[in-house]
């Protein structure tokens, strides 16, 4: 399974932080969460010690309240695990629309992104 191979490239704190982020996100936003993907250097396996962890979060509908909740979770993860998560947040409609445009950013998410 791809996720297992990916997780082996992450250190123990990073694995714990990602797992906890997913748990808290699902607890706080429940059915609003459509998809969570790891992408960027951590997903490619070419990160360095100072690399952050890029995470795509797709919500059914985004709002300032939902974004605030996500950033509160990220801040708490940083304090507890000393792991910097960098979420990119889209609503489902934005994500689908952007997916139809062949930008480098969206191509990277499509090809290197790993669902968590």
Which functions belong to the PLM regions below?
Residues 41:
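P-loop (Walker A) phosphate-binding loop of NTP-binding proteins
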Residues 1-34, 44-49, 59-116:
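Catalytic core of pol beta-like nucleotidyltransferases
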Residues 54-57:
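Short beta-strand->loop micro-motif that forms the acidic, two-metal-ion catalytic signature
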């Amino acid at each position: 399974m791809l996720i297992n191979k990916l997780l082996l490239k992450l250190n123990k704190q990073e694995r714990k932080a990602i797992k906890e982020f997913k748990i808290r996100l699902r607890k706080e936003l429940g059915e609003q969460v459509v998809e969570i993907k790891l992408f960027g250097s951590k997903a490619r396996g070419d990160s360095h010690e100072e690399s952050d962890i890029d995470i795509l979060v797709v919500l059914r509908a985004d709002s300032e309240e939902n974004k605030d909740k996500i950033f509160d979770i990220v801040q708490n993860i940083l304090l507890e695990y000393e792991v910097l998560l960098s979420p990119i947040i889209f609503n489902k409609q934005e994500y689908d629309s952007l997916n139809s445009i062949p930008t480098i950013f969206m191509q990277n998410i499509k090809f290197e992104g790993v669902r968590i």
